[in-house]
Amino acid sequence: MKALIVLGLVLLSVTVQGKVFERCELARTLKRLGMDGYRGISLANWMCLAKWESGYNTRATNYNAGDRSTDYGIFQINSRYWCNDGKTPGAVNACHLSCSALLQDNIADAVACAKRVVRDPQGIRAWVAWRNRCQNRDVRQYVQGCGV
């Protein structure tokens, strides 16, 4: 009985924490979902962005007190413009989805929304972490050894 309780608590903690992808697992997943070369953006750049935005964590969130918005998920997609969290003033919801969809272990919705973000004129430059950590840098290390 104790073993079942411990197992239940372990499983509960896993579901609360969400999925933190291993580097190569995420690279393969993003490639399968059509991110490599999407709008001219290499898979290595997407991997660099995800590393510095969320640490590959699907449940990452970050509140922005200045505009009272929140960044959600593996790509840290913002509730001011891209998703609806029901609490961000003046939200646009350009991806037409709930922000909670960006926190799922299945990242298909997050990928679809990230593709929507880069179709705007700013492209991948919409992400501050990409500009600060990935732009004009050798990002091959993020996919090295992954066979992608």
Swiss-Prot record:
PROSITE patterns: GLYCOSYL_HYDROL_F22_1, GLYCOSYL_HYDROL_F22_2
Stored SUPFAM superfamilies: Lysozyme-like (SSF53955)
Cell compartments where the protein resides: Secreted
EC number: 3.2.1.17
Any one GO molecular function term: lysozyme activity
Keywords, in A-Z order: Amyloid, Amyloidosis, Antimicrobial, Bacteriolytic enzyme, Disease variant, Disulfide bond, Glycosidase, Hydrolase, Secreted, Signal
Domain of life according to the entry: Eukaryota
InterPro entries: Glyco_hydro_22, Glyco_hydro_22_CS, Glyco_hydro_22_lys, Lysozyme-like_dom_sf
Family matches, as Gene3D superfamilies: 1.10.530.10
Catalysis: reaction(s): Hydrolysis of (1->4)-beta-linkages between N-acetylmuramic acid and N-acetyl-D-glucosamine residues in a peptidoglycan and between N-acetyl-D-glucosamine residues in chitodextrins
Residue span(s) of domain C-type lysozyme: 19-148
Family listed: Belongs to the glycosyl hydrolase 22 family.
Additional note from the record: Lysozyme C is capable of both hydrolysis and transglycosylation; it also shows a slight esterase activity. It acts rapidly on both peptide-substituted and unsubstituted peptidoglycan, and slowly on chitin oligosaccharides.
Protein's name according to its UniProt entry: Lysozyme C
Native species: Homo sapiens
Gene (name only): LYZ
